[in-house]
């Protein structure tokens, strides 16, 4: 519910599926009542292993409060997960217009992870494909309950954050998690960002397409760590 869509704007829909038998799925963007269908497409899911499917949706009308609907008619055992909807022109999973607005603000230093999220985030989850990063329950559910039913998600990883900082011209400021992550895991994060390709985690960064160290100079220990 409550998805703002723009007329003629292509969106990328994705989800993972496993089924006992072939099932035709229908994906649509509609009004809140489901009476107006702005766009609709179908695909066939088949197989007992998780398989990712992506389709493009282009609504023929704008709606600030649209619904995303996934349906199927055939009876059977169906599992779905990792549902996502992004503008086709997204920047590393972020809305392009928001990134442009951040440029205009002239942000000089950008901190991440921020707030209570910093006390839950595990940077190593970001090494997995986004569909394989487990959600985690927020210890301050009051903040996230209205939006994500009390859960946070690791949809942005270290490489995405550095790309954002470079795009908007900001100095990256990374907050490590000394509460749940070990000193060794946090040291590995520093090495991933700043080590050259001769170090284990610098080599991993290079293997992921980023040969030169990120040279992150600003680091902090947790968020409100005294509480």
Residue ranges and their predicted role:
Residues 154-155, 161, 168, 178-197, ...:
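Catalytic-domain carbohydrate-binding cleft regions of carbohydrate-active enzymes
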Residues 93-97, 153-161, 196-211:
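Alpha-helical scaffolding within the catalytic cores
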Residues 62-63, 102-104, 166-167, 210-215, ...:
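Extracellular/periplasmic catalytic domains that process cell-envelope and extracellular macromolecules
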Residues 1-154, 171, 181, 187:
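Extracellular and organelle-lumenal recognition/adhesion modules and their flexible linkers in secreted
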Residues 71-73, 113-116, 199-227:
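Active-site groove signature of glycoside hydrolases
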Residues 172-176:
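Short catalytic-loop micro-motif centered on adjacent basic/acidic residues
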């Amino acid at each position: 519910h409550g998805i703002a869509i723009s007329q003629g704007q292509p969106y990328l829909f994705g989800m993972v599926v496993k089924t006992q038998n072939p099932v035709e799925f229908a994906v649509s963007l509609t009004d809140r009542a489901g009476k107006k269908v702005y766009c609709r497409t179908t695909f066939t899911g088949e197989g007992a292993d998780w398989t990712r499917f992506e389709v493009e949706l282009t609504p023929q009308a704008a709606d600030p409060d649209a619904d995303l609907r996934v349906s199927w008619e055939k009876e059977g055992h169906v599992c779905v997960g990792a549902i996502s909807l992004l503008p086709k022109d997204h920047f590393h999973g972020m809305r392009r217009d928001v990134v442009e607005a951040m440029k205009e603000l002239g942000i000089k230093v950008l901190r991440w992870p921020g707030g209570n999220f910093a006390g839950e985030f595990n940077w190593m989850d970001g090494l997995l494909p986004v569909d394989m990063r487990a959600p985690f329950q927020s210890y301050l559910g009051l903040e996230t309950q209205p939006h994500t039913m009390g859960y946070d998600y690791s949809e942005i990883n270290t490489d995405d954050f550095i790309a954002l900082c470079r795009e908007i011209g900001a100095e990256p400021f990374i907050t490590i998690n000394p509460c749940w992550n070990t000193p060794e895991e946090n040291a590995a994060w520093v090495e991933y960002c700043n080590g050259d390709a001769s170090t284990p985690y610098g080599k991993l960064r290079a293997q992921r397409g980023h040969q030169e160290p990120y040279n992150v100079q600003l680091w902090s220990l947790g968020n409100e760590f005294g509480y």
